[in-house]
């Protein structure tokens, strides 16, 4: 009887030990201008207010639930005087998307819009390392279920850049509050 118990223990103990070993966590991305994917609402508000450039942080709560919030403000980062429109979307108090938007080069012949894109690419590469291409005018850095995305558009000398910090684990929770779109066919 004892030999059966011992043999069962020798078979089961390694299996339970393997089951208890946690999967290694992927390190999250470094923060960008003090913000990171999945940042909590309170930390976002504190940082956004400290960077607000003659603007008031505005937040709107969903009409259907208080668990969905959108915020936005014009900011100026004192470290390099960069200006952005900062916005974020929160699900259950955590940001699924934090976005920085900027533009340059309207009505000028010296192509400052091109310089904006070049400067933004250089800045993000310095922080996050080598990017993966994402389409014709986009880059991406992946950190498990979190990602940093840069996209840019242009017309003439004008350029628009958008940097988004995405947390897909938080984004998946939105399904609890938003119904799937129905069929559009009559």
PLM features per residue range, with description:
Residues 1-8:
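Bacterial N-terminal signal peptides that target proteins for export
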Residues 5, 24-27, 87:
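Short, functionally important structural connectors and interaction interfaces within domains
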Residues 6, 90-94, 102-104:
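Generic secondary-structure microfeatures
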Residues 11-19:
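Hydrophobic h-region of N-terminal signal peptides that target proteins for export
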Residues 20-70, 97-186:
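Non-cytosolic coordination micro-motifs
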Residues 72-92:
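Compositionally biased P/S/T/G-rich terminal and signal peptide-adjacent segments
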């Amino acid at each position: 009887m004892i030999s059966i118990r011992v043999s069962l223990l020798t078979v089961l103990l390694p299996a339970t030990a393997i089951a208890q070993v946690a999967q290694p966590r992927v390190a999250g991305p470094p923060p960008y201008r003090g913000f990171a994917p999945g940042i909590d609402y309170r930390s976002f508000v504190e940082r956004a207010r400290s960077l607000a450039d003659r603007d008031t942080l505005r937040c709107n709560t969903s009409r259907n639930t208080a668990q969905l919030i959108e915020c936005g403000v014009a900011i100026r980062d004192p470290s390099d005087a960069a200006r952005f429109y900062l916005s974020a979307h929160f699900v259950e108090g955590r940001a699924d998307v934090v976005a920085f938007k900027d533009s340059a080069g309207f009505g000028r012949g010296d192509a400052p819009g091109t310089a904006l894109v070049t400067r933004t690419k250089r800045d993000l590469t310095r922080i996050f390392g080598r990017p993966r291409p994402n389409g014709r005018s986009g880059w991406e850095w992946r950190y498990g279920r979190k990602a940093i995305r840069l996209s840019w558009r242009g017309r003439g000398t004008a350029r628009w850049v958008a940097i988004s910090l995405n947390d897909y684990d938080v984004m998946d929770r939105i399904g609890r509050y938003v119904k799937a779109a129905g069929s559009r066919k009559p």
